[in-house]
């Protein structure tokens, strides 16, 4: 593709003479030059103004010249020379990746004009003029404008590279293309863009900026000229078959149009599809009634821009000519006014819906100047009178199609618990956020580790109260294991260490479903109490020595492995040798003890070392503390093993009860094989330090350090990881479906305010935790019900996947509305479902879709981004239902009568060619 450069900003400015002698005599003195240029640089940025780039080297030389104060100095800079900023002196393209302050300085137009008039511009260089543009939240000089490749539909091989500002309108691109390609004034033209995927998008709105149109440097823009016979030559364009949603021959049902996912924007698509299928709101935009009510001066609004963007979207989706559309213009408009929706992160469809309804209301508010309105005082007055006054006050400041369609009225009653003072207010609402009845129980999956080493750990599923404590978990597990709750310690194990050791009073809400929870059978306490005779429970880690990568260094690293242990040790018999023996006993299921043959084989050739050990009895106690314990001779060990094994449930090794093991003479004449050494460590399993047994009682974490060869020969990793499943593992907590009316009843029940949100009682003159009750007083034409599926607490976040059963027709609110009933108009309280926003997945990720009933056909459809398919009514109810849209029956009946009396014009019956469709056939 041939590219022809054309930079409309590159017109040369008449320059003064290049040398100092030809400078005009009107050049001011140096101080005045410095003041004029320096003051100009401090000028604030204003959108649309021109600034100019000056090469940093020339500017610094000029700066030194004027600061020197000598007008005849040799530092005279000469003509402005920006050659270092250009790639070459033919195309005059700006070099890439120039940095302000390092490569150039920016000057506003007045300062630039001064310098040019004083010093001139070298070699007929074009001035580097750039515009100030306004981006969301910031103004900046657009040093690198957008470069677009303009082509004609009749010649896709020859492209013109044209620079534009991101703040320029699409219409400027169109007019530039018409000028460059010599299009006659009477000829019709339109633009298309080719995106990175190769498909083409129609640039329908020519009044928006290139930034809002999401155009990028290097993007291909195609100008299409209408044929003389009135048709468009779109079919001849390269790549048209990549646009299945832009088919001029496609004539479908209005409203059955998908929305392309721009990247995690399914939440937006779902909210838009629901709102688009609210009949009275869509008719309001399709019939252009919104044009008469746009409020451009509302300081709380978006200058009408959000309403206009939504109107364009509705008109496209209800034109009947699109299978799907790309809502990038609307997305950019939302991000422009609500920074939380900038980018392409996942958000909540209900949050976007709330912003959209509020934004549309303010953009379409019929009240141009809001007056101050005092709050109603309902003390001692009839509810009917107070409610009517509250609604009238609301309408005096808020009057729009959104209020007409979606706003209702609450009655809020607060009662002081001390003096009984009652406060009644009536407040408007736009939607109901109703809680789901939460199950008071939860199922926890835990591993029970018995003291008997012959038994493998057991996997259990226990039912516990959601708001219970760790003690409730121990009681529930006790029914499965027959172990007393006070003989259990609950731990969160993560990465081979104890992440947390729980106290009995700790809340269960601190345990997440993904946590690995181990419950250990013990006979004592972890934190010793002075004077207590209880056993000490010692946390024990397993570590393997690994050679350092520096082979000239004798240092060995240590890596945790396996599951940590909690070992009960008698307080008055705590010793290294006793701890070693009890650990050997606890590990006996998956650790093989060395035999006499192993000892003999390993000690051959080392007799001299054994003799040294035997003779050095005077220093044996010191060695014991430094290197950890060794084993007893074969006879004594065997007796202790048998006693330990026969101790049964206590799991307590009798060797700890033998006073002789606490003396310094316990090592035998001949040392036996030592499988591991013991070290005191911190809770992370690090920070080794030599510690006496007495000190170990105050720093109870112990590590068993294994040599790699010892671990390989004697430690059975497969057996160590083994466990059995208890019969309760298959238990699943049954979740019964919930009726929508149960949620509404829960919404209207009395609740006590939380400590973080007290109420100020005008009678007590204090903040009180009052009781609060909400009642429905007046319902809107379209009632939006938000099911609060997402639960947040201090320790956890979860999504409730409870099935909420809701009626498609005849949802009767008469039992919830406390306003005196109009018996002659029962339809005022009955509603029919028209749309559902669904959420699939969990808290961190998920996907939004929509069920919606077409206002013209009455057929339900499933909208999944750009995919749309018809569905039966029995498919609508699911656990994914998140936001429900109900329409009052009297409104629906009135709309049906209006529609039947009118003759709709369908796309199929229209003979006028659609100017927004590109033929792909």
From Swiss-Prot:
Residues 657-666, 676-697 have a biased composition (Polar residues). It holds the Pfam family Ubiquitin_3. One of its GO terms (biological process) is ubiquitin-dependent protein catabolic process. InterPro entries: DUSP-like_sf, Papain-like_cys_pep_sf, Pept_C19_DUSP, Peptidase_C19_UCH, Ub_carboxyl-term_hydrolase, Ub_USP-typ, USP_CS, USP_dom. Residues 28-133 form the DUSP domain. Signal peptide: none annotated. The active site is at residues 266, 847. It catalyses: Thiol-dependent hydrolysis of ester, thioester, amide, peptide and isopeptide bonds formed by the C-terminal Gly of ubiquitin (a 76-residue protein attached to proteins as an intracellular targeting signal). Its EC number is 3.4.19.12. Residues 1-16, 895-915 have a biased composition (Low complexity). Residues 597-624 have a biased composition (Acidic residues). The modification Phosphoserine is found at residues 596, 692, 906. GO terms for molecular function: cysteine-type deubiquitinase activity; cysteine-type endopeptidase activity; transcription corepressor binding. The modification N6-acetyllysine is found at residue 194. One of its GO terms (cellular component) is nucleus. The keyword Lipid metabolism does not apply. Protease that can remove conjugated ubiquitin from target proteins and polyubiquitin chains. Inhibits the degradation of target proteins by the proteasome. Cleaves preferentially 'Lys-6' and 'Lys-63'-linked ubiquitin chains. Has lower activity with 'Lys-11' and 'Lys-33'-linked ubiquitin chains, and extremely low activity with 'Lys-27', 'Lys-29' and 'Lys-48'-linked ubiquitin chains (in vitro). Plays a role in the regulation of pathways leading to NF-kappa-B activation. Plays a role in the regulation of DNA repair after double-stranded DNA breaks. Monomer. Associated component of the Polycomb group (PcG) multiprotein PRC1-like complex. Interacts with RANBP9/RANBPM. Interacts with BRCA2. Interacts with CHUK/IKKA. Interacts with NFKBIA. Interacts with SPRY3, RAE1, MYCBP2/PAM, and KCTD6. Belongs to the peptidase C19 family. This is Ubiquitin carboxyl-terminal hydrolase 11. It comes from Rattus norvegicus. The gene is Usp11.
């Amino acid at each position: 593709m041939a590219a022809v450069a054309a930079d409309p900003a590159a017109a040369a400015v008449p320059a003064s003479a290049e040398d100092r002698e030809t400078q005009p005599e009107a050049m001011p003195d140096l101080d005045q030059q410095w003041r004029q240029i320096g003051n100009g640089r401090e000028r604030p940025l204003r959108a649309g103004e021109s600034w100019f780039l000056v090469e940093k080297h020339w500017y610094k030389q000029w700066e030194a010249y004027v600061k020197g104060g000598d007008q005849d100095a040799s530092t005279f800079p000469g003509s402005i020379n920006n050659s270092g900023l250009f790639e070459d002196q033919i195309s005059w393209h700006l070099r890439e990746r120039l940095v302000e302050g390092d490569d150039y300085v920016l000057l506003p137009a007045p300062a630039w004009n001064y310098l040019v008039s004083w010093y001139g511009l070298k070699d007929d260089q074009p001035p580097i003029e750039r515009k100030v543009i306004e981006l969301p939240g910031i103004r900046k000089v657009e040093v690198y404008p957008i470069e677009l490749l303009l082509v004609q539909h009749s010649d896709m091989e020859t492209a013109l590279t044209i620079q534009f500002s991101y703040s320029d309108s699409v219409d400027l691109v169109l007019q530039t293309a018409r000028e460059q390609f010599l299009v006659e004034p009477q000829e019709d033209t339109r633009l298309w863009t080719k995106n990175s995927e190769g498909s083409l998008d129609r640039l329908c709105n020519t009044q928006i900026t290139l930034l809002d149109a999401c155009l990028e440097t290097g993007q291909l823009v195609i100008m299409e000229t209408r044929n003389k016979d009135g048709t468009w030559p779109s079919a001849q364009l390269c790549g048209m078959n990549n646009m299945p949603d832009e088919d001029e021959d496609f004539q479908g049902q209005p409203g059955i149009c998908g929305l392309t996912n721009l990247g995690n924007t399914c939440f937006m698509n779902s909210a838009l599809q629901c709102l688009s299928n609210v009949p009275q709101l869509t008719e309001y935009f399709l019939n252009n009634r919104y044009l008469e009510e746009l409020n451009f001066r509302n300081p709380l609004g978006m200058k009408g821009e959000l309403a206009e963007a939504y109107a364009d979207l509705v008109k496209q989706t209800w034109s009947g000519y699109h299978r799907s559309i790309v809502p990038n213009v609307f997305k950019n408009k939302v991000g422009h006014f609500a920074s939380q929706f900038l980018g392409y992160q996942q958000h909540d469809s209900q949050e976007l819906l709330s912003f959209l309804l509020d934004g549309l209301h303010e953009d379409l508010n019929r009240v141009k100047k809001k007056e101050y309105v005092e709050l109603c005082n309902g003390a001692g007055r009839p509810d009917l009178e107070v409610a009517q006054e509250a609604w009238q006050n609301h309408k005096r400041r808020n009057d729009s199609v959104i209020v007409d369609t979606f706003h209702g009225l609450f009655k809020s009653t607060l009662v002081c618990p001390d003096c009984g003072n009652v406060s009644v207010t009536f407040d408007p609402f736009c939607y109901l956020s109703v809680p789901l009845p939460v199950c008071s129980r939860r199922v926890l999956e835990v591993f029970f580790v018995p003291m008997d080493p012959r038994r493998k750990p057991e996997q259990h599923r226990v039912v516990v109260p959601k708001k219970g404590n760790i003690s409730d978990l121990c009681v529930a597990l006790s029914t499965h294991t027959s172990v007393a709750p006070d003989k259990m310690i609950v731990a969160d194990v993560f990465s081979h260490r104890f992440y947390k050791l729980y106290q009995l009073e700790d809340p269960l809400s601190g345990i997440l479903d993904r946590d690995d929870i181990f419950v250990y059978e013990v006979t004592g306490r972890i934190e010793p109490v002075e004077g207590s005779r209880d056993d000490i429970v010692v946390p024990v880690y397993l570590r393997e020595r690994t050679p350092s990568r520096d082979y000239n260094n004798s240092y060995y690293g240590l890596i945790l492995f396996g599951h940590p242990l909690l070992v009960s040790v008698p307080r008055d018999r705590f010793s290294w040798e006793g701890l070693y023996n009890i650990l050997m006993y606890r590990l006996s299921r998956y650790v093989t003890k060395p035999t006499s043959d192993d000892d003999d084989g390993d000690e051959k050739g080392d007799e001299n070392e054994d003799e040294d050990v035997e003779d050095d009895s005077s220093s044996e106690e010191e060695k014991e503390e430094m290197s950890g314990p060794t084993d007893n001779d074969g006879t004594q060990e065997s007796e202790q093993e048998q006693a330990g094994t026969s101790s049964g449930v206590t799991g307590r090794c009798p060797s700890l009860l033998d006073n002789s093991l606490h003396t310094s003479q316990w090592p035998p004449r001949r040392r036996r094989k030592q499988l591991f050494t013991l070290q005191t460590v911190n809770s992370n399993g690090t920070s080794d330090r030599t510690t006496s047994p007495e000190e170990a009682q105050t720093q109870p974490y112990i590590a068993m350090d294994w040599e790699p060869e010892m671990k390989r020969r004697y430690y059975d990793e497969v057996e160590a990881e083994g466990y059995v499943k208890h019969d309760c593992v298959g238990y699943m907590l049954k979740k019964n479906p919930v009726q929508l009316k149960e949620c509404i009843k829960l919404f209207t029940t009395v609740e006590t305010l939380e400590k973080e949100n007290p109420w100020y009682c005008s009678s007590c003159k204090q903040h009180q935790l009052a009781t609060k009750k909400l009642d429905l007083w007046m319902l809107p034409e379209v009632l939006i019900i938000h099911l609060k599926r997402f639960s947040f607490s201090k320790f956890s976040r979860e999504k409730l996947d409870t099935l909420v059963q809701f009626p498609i027709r005849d949802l009767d609110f008469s039992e919830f509305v406390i306003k005196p009933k109009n018996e002659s108009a029962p339809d005022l309280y009955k509603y029919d479902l028209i749309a559902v926003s669904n959420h699939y997945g969990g808290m961190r990720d998920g996907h939004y879709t929509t069920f919606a009933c077409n206002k013209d056909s009455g057929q339900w459809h499933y909208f999944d981004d750009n995919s749309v398919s018809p569905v039966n009514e029995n498919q609508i109810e699911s656990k994914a239902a998140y936001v429900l849209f109900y329409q009052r029956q009297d409104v629906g009946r009135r709309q049906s009568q209006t529609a039947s009396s009118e003759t709709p014009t369908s796309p199929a019956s229209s003979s006028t060619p659609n100017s927004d469709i590109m033929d792909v056939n």
